UniProtKB/Swiss-Prot annotation:
Residues recorded with modification Phosphotyrosine: 64, 142, 331, 333
Positions where N6-acetyllysine occurs in the chain: 49
Residues bearing the modification Phosphothreonine: 41, 556
Residues carrying sugar: 23
Modified residues annotated as N-acetylalanine in this record: 2
Protein name per Swiss-Prot or TrEMBL: Catenin beta-1
Gene assigned in the entry: Ctnnb1
Self-association state and partner proteins as the record states: Two separate complex-associated pools are found in the cytoplasm. The majority is present as component of an E-cadherin/ catenin adhesion complex composed of at least E-cadherin/CDH1 and beta-catenin/CTNNB1, and possibly alpha-catenin/CTNNA1; the complex is located to adherens junctions. The stable association of CTNNA1 is controversial as CTNNA1 was shown not to bind to F-actin when assembled in the complex. Alternatively, the CTNNA1-containing complex may be linked to F-actin by other proteins such as LIMA1.
Xref: PANTHER family: ARMADILLO SEGMENT POLARITY PROTEIN
Amino acid sequence: MATQADLMELDMAMEPDRKAAVSHWQQQSYLDSGIHSGATTTAPSLSGKGNPEEEDVDTSQVLYEWEQGFSQSFTQEQVADIDGQYAMTRAQRVRAAMFPETLDEGMQIPSTQFDAAHPTNVQRLAEPSQMLKHAVVNLINYQDDAELATRAIPELTKLLNDEDQVVVNKAAVMVHQLSKKEASRHAIMRSPQMVSAIVRTMQNTNDVETARCTAGTLHNLSHHREGLLAIFKSGGIPALVKMLGSPVDSVLFYAITTLHNLLLHQEGAKMAVRLAGGLQKMVALLNKTNVKFLAITTDCLQILAYGNQESKLIILASGGPQALVNIMRTYTYEKLLWTTSRVLKVLSVCSSNKPAIVEAGGMQALGPHLTDPSQRLVQNCLWTLRNLSDAATKQEGMEGLLGTLVQLLGSDDINVVTCAAGILSNLTCNNYKNKMMVCQVGGIEALVRTVLRAGDREDITEPAICALRHLTSRHQEAEMAQNAVRLHYGLPVVVKLLHPPSHWPLIKATVGLIRNLALCPANHAPLREQGAIPRLVQLLVRAHQDTQRRTSMGGTQQQFVEGVRMEEIVEGCTGALHILARDVHNRIVIRGLNTIPLFVQLLYSPIENIQRVAAGVLCELAQDKEAAEAIEAEGATAPLTELLHSRNEGVATYAAAVLFRMSEDKPQDYKKRLSVELTSSLFRTEPMAWNETADLGLDIGAQGEALGYRQDDPSYRSFHSGGYGQDALGMDPMMEHEMGGHHPGADYPVDGLPDLGHAQDLMDGLPPGDSNQLAWFDTDL
């Protein structure tokens, strides 16, 4: 029978090597596990054929395929000869597949495998055998290692505590070797006495090799939770922190990586590291040059500083901000830059660390990384820059950063756009150089496009609108910026933001932007056509009613709604209407909305800024005779006369101007009395002004200039409004620093004023306007 012949052939091939096979297994510390007794057994053939490798195929087809696979042709006799060779070496092929270690070196066995991607049947059958063999080997090795370690640990513990340092060194080396194998490593970590001895030896030794071996052992143990707990309970953290002062790089590496594993996975490790002085030691290591070592060290600092103010202050006191900024400026290793930017991000929300990072050049060091291909690095740098930017408005050398931020506004990543808009908003605050730079690199167009794309995402639209508000005021390119918003189709979307679902912070910023846009006469008609005036009046009425309701209920403190005071909305809307009222058609619309009674009522406001803008808008409306009569009919003369005595020069000036225009049709006696009243009120603190007025030269028609408002005025106050929201890591919000009120322009025409004696000299004698006082509309620090 063919199958029996095959089995006999296999048995004859295996017989001579049977003892060698058994011997080989015994040399590997194995006993005979049944391989010898089962050497001559095999499963019967399922096909019943003599040669299990043969297939029932057509011979001619085989010959055809054979010829296709070789460049030379074979005769029938040659094919039979080759087939015979394969039959004679069948046993060797089986042995090579299942027990390759039993073959003699150099033995050549013809292979039946023609395609490396398709193993033969014998090779496939041999795979489970090989897997079983390796499993048995691993199991026996593991058992041997565990038994050896268990027997050796008590003795090694004694040797580690020996007084002879040579003995201690040898024991440390042996323990280190044992810790490299998993079984013995588990045995070590389960012995508190051994772990304590390792920690004590590492801490007390003066021998470099002993320190290296003990630190290496703890490093190996720290890859297991059980090992981390054993190190923690044995007081390993203070010892490892001490090793951070070692001059040996390998010891430093073992110590910092072990501490890193503890900080990541062991409860209580953070506090232990802080108490042991680990923060100071880690900051001191930031001057090293090994980038991988620095990456681990900075990650440790991030873990320790996150959510812990005391740690942030310790890092600051240790010189951390400067060292971290130097790393960002010096290295290119992505992981190091990423871990360092994470530390800076955590520190950037600390009010003490923030200015230190900025002064160390943090803005300039982080900026170049915004074009890095690593998105995680870019995102961390953006968050950090966003948090730092409100403290960096006075920084120089920001041109490159500003250009990059404008480019990033076109990103498809919402987080990138959000951060870029926020940073631009803060950096353009009260910095005319930054404003001009952003305008010159296409910032207006980019910001308008950003607002258009953002839709109702206020975390993007609010900072973008704030940035536009800054860019349209108080710098040489401001008029160009005011025009550019219109030319890039921004007016419709800006006016739309005054409507729901916009929240009060966004509405406040939009009102300020509209006020600035109205400084450009070319924007008057488009803003009117977009319905800006009725909506501003609606917002004004609503905010005023809210303040009146609160006052009637006995409230004394100003109320915040979504972080915005309603008094700010009253002031902002009135100021925007004041500038829009420079256009005659806009004045008609404003008067037609029955706003004059409200403006007159605002003259009684206890807030000087509201008094000023109310008087300002009445001043513009009073240019029209009908409006002047309506103002007088509402009883405005009394409050305006009272405001002539205001300590705020802007309020007094506007009140005087309204009274001028209201007196146009009055008798001459009335005009003379008014002239005397104005003279005594406006020049009460300057008795010699009448003789000096010719040289003072107030330019009443200067667009956007403020009227007589000095910084030492008690009404010149600052406040903070909330930023654009906090991030998921507890980031502090960006602070938008703003002044309490803006300062209305004074470019109303004076040609039509009646002759009031010295009236023109009176107007010329006022202090010149300060163009840097438009505070409500451009955030001031």
